[in-house]
Amino acid sequence: MKYKKKKYAVLSENEELELASNGDFIMKKDFIENYEIIDFHCHSYEGLFQLFPPSLQKKKTDHNRALMDLSCFPFSMNLFDLNKVYFSDCPTKLFSIDGVKTRIKLFTGAFVLNYATIERLLMDMDHNGISKAVIHQINPPDKNSADIMEEIVAQNERLYTFGSVHPFDEDIDSKIKHYMNCHIKGWKINPHVCGFSIDCEESLALIEKLSRTGLPILCCSGLGLPQEVLSTNIPSRQTKKDVMNQRLDKYEIVLDTFPETTFILAHSGCFEFEDMVNLLKKHPNVYTDISIQPAGHIKTLIGEIGSERVLFGTDYPFVTQAFSILSVLRATENEEERTFIFSKNAKRLLNGSF
């Protein structure tokens, strides 16, 4: 097991956690057995493989590898911190051990997806008491994983999926029509991965078409790295550019233009959390998910806007599911709050009664 000493140190400080045989952290059953948990923000190889060039489209079935060790987050075990966004502290100097590790992980961390097969997802859901999950597709222009994901969700009642149409697709209308004949529960838009600004003309035109379907739209939102990291050479120039595509101020025109559309702004705004709280107060048609956010921020969300528009999500496989579950347990004060966040809000959206 990699990082065995450091992982056991984490266990000594968090009685709710244990280690699976592959070295990933999981929740102890005693702490989760009374809850129905729906992970509203997951990814899988099958839903994202089109983002990779053909030479890297390789599904890995080794369930003995810890996904936490392969992913971007935490940036290193030395930086692990359950009370921070991404459950990781952030280095501010490239020429340091953690700075170099972070730069490498920002480049290689996406390859954890090769191991995040449907079989692995279901296994990890079982380990963490998660009953159902929403898998979000992300597609480059003129490609999609609609048929593959349709076959998967049709064969497994524990899984749902959100469709993905790129704003630069040549025939957006036909893709939307095809998806609407599938069992999708909503739409996924990812500006920083797909290379467009959420408020650009093409994006707004796409959102208008998606809004007509009546399905909710989940968008990655907020600054994905803190300013103190962006001011260094740790991220590449392209990464620095891409993370700006979903700044929360860019969402103002989106939300003002489509006040009747149900949006889920993912990650609670990442490192723009305070701005997300204000945005949620202003726009009652907006939900958020708590993927990557620590307990302190989740507690603030509940105190400021209530628990009825907060969704449980993890951003699996990039973030260990147990950390987000533990964060909700620590942030909530009663069973009603936990029920809303873990499952009730998700059921409302998945059943179309929002």
Q: What do these predicted ranges mean?
A:
Residues 41, 125, 179, 187, ...:
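Conserved, mostly hydrophobic/aromatic
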Residues 11-15, 19, 127, 131-132, ...:
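Active-site gating/metal-coordination segments in enzymes
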Residues 41-47, 220, 267:
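Histidine-centered divalent metal-coordination motifs
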Residues 104-115, 160-169:
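Active-site mouth loops of central-metabolism enzymes
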Residues 142-146, 172-173, 272-276, 295-299, ...:
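Short, well-ordered alpha-helical microsegments
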Residues 185-186, 199-311:
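Catalytic pocket-lining loop regions of alpha/beta-barrel enzymes
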Residues 37-40, 135-136, 162-163, 188, ...:
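Active-site neighborhood of phospho(di)ester-bond hydrolases with catalytic His/Asp-centered motifs
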Residues 1-36, 50-106, 116-123, 132, ...:
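Mid-to-C-terminal alpha-helical segments outside catalytic/metal-binding sites
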